[in-house]
Amino acid sequence: MAIINMSDLDLQGKRVLIREDLNVPVSNGVVTSDARLRASLPTIELALAKGAAVMVMSHLGRPTEGEYNSEFSMQPVVDYLAKALSSPVRLATDYLDGVEVAVGEVVVFENVRFNKGEKKNDEALSKKMAALCDVYVMDAFGTAHRAEASTNGVGLYAPIACAGPLLAQELNALGKALDNPARPMVAIVGGSKVSTKLTVLESLSGIVDQLVVGGGIANTFIAAAGHNVGKSLYEADLIDEAKRLVANAQSRGGDIPVPTDVVVAGEFSPTATATLKSVSDVSDSDMIFDIGPDSAEALAKIIESAGTIVWNGPVGVFEFDQFGEGTKRIAQAIADSKAFSIAGGGDTLAAVDKYGIADKVSYISTGGGAFLEFLEGKELPAVAMLKKRGA
C-alpha cells in the first residue's frame, strides 16, 4: 500500500492543513531551540510554492487538555515562523468552526492540546479539523506513534491525507536502515534501563549482526556475565533476560560484547573523580559511569567495519566530561565510518551536538518515542492511517 506524498499533489488554490511537530522549548516568550522549527520550514515553503492556502498545527508542552494556558501558546512559534518566512503569519485561536485563510497565507492554529478530546483521538474533533481543509498533511514523525485527533483522526476524514516531505524522508531513512540494510549491521543501544528498551533490544537482536549495549543497560549485561557492578544502576530482575538476549545473538553468529574495562566513581556528580578499572576489579562501592578506552576501541573497530549503523543512546554519562570519553569515541567512529548511519533519541542527539558530528551522520531522526517504536517493529498509527488513505 502506497502512501500519498504531498510533493506529488497539485495544491493550487487548495486549503492545506499541515500537522508539524513544533513542540519546542520556550523561555520568556522566545523559542530557545529551533531545530524542529527549521526542519518544518521546507514543507511549509513547498506548500506555499505550490499555491496553497496554508494552515499549520502542533502541540506545545503538556497543558491541561481543553484549557487555554498562555504559557503553552503557539505565539512564540508564530513569531519565529514570521521571521523565518519573511512574511506575516497569523495565530488562529478559535478555528474549529472555520478559519479564513488566503492563498499564499500561513495561519498557525493555537495549541491542539487546548482542544478537549485531542489525546483520545475524539471523532467529533477529528471531523471538525478535517472539515477545515482540502488536503491534510501529516509531517510530524515525532508524534507519529500517538493516535490523536491532530495526528491520526483528522487524516481519516480529510478529503485527501498524505505524508509531508519530512515524514517521508524519515520513513525512507528508517526503511533503508531496517528493511534492507547493508551488512554488517551494527546497533548501539544505550540508556539507563533494560526494561524501557527491552522490546527494542529483542527486535534488533533478531536483525543486526552486532548489538552493542551501553550506559545503565550495559551494567545489567556486565552483571549477567558474572561480574560485580558495585553500586551501579542495573536491573537484577532482568539478568536472565540479558543472558537470553546474548544466547540469541550468539546463535545467529553475532554477539553482545560486554566491556572489558570501565570508568568508575564513588558518587554521581559533575565533580566525581573518574577511575579506570578492569571490569573484573569493580568493587562493592564503585559506580560504573562509562566504558574504558580498550572497550571503546573494540567498539570503534566493530563500527569501522559496519555497512549500516543504528545509534540510540550514549554509552556513558557523557554530560560529565570525565565520563564522556566512551561516547565521544563511538561518535568519532560513526563520523569516520562510510556506513549508512542513523541516530535518534534525545540523549543521542545531545551527544551528536556535543561532539560536533551532525554533518557526518547519514540521517538524524527527529522522533524519540516514534524512533524507538519503529525500531521495535511496530506500525506507527499515523503511518497505518496514511497507508489506509493511500489504498
From Swiss-Prot:
SUPFAM superfamilies according to UniProt: Phosphoglycerate kinase
Source species of the chain: Shewanella putrefaciens (strain CN-32 / ATCC BAA-453)
HAMAP family: Phosphoglyc_kinase
Name of the protein: Phosphoglycerate kinase
GO biological process: one example: glycolytic process
Positions that bind substrate: 21-23, 36, 59-62, 113, 146
Family membership noted in the UniProt record: Belongs to the phosphoglycerate kinase family.
Pathway the protein acts in: Carbohydrate degradation; glycolysis; pyruvate from D-glyceraldehyde 3-phosphate: step 2/5
Keyword tags: ATP-binding, Cytoplasm, Glycolysis, Kinase, Nucleotide-binding, Transferase
Keyword match Metal-binding: no
PANTHER family given in the database record: PHOSPHOGLYCERATE KINASE (PTHR11406), PHOSPHOGLYCERATE KINASE 1, CHLOROPLASTIC-RELATED (PTHR11406:SF23)
